[in-house]
Amino acid sequence: MADITVVNDTGELYNVINQKKSEGYLESELTIISKSKLHLNDLHDSEISLISTSGTFSDRMTKLLTGEDGEHAVLSRYNLAPDELEKYKQLILDDKMLVVAVRDKSSHQEVHENNSAYEEIDITHFAEASKGPKA
């Protein structure tokens, strides 16, 4: 389940990010959703996802032609109830930011078990095991 926090300004945004990190969330588990693109260089250099619901110019044109709702499209990935979805959509349209924290429950154990790069190889070699000439 997504842990969503509503934020009013960038000062509060940094406080919420630090709070989520202190709760044990990784940067890669945090997403910031806003109506327009955030110009915060220190966040662009982090693993925190920044999503603007307005999108690029081509996204806006596509939405105009298809009638797609950008806020609904972004929020739908978090499996929210319809009333919650409408509430958060309206908050985004009111220029609030959402900090979404979702724990990454995926396991990478299979990669470690099946990838030969992680295989430990015994490279001890004794002379008597050699097939070459013995001197």
From Swiss-Prot:
Pfam families linked to this entry: YflT
InterPro entries the record matches: GSP17M-like_dom
Superkingdom in the source lineage: Bacteria
Family according to the record: Belongs to the UPF0355 family.
Protein name: UPF0355 protein SACOL0457
Source organism: Staphylococcus aureus (strain COL)
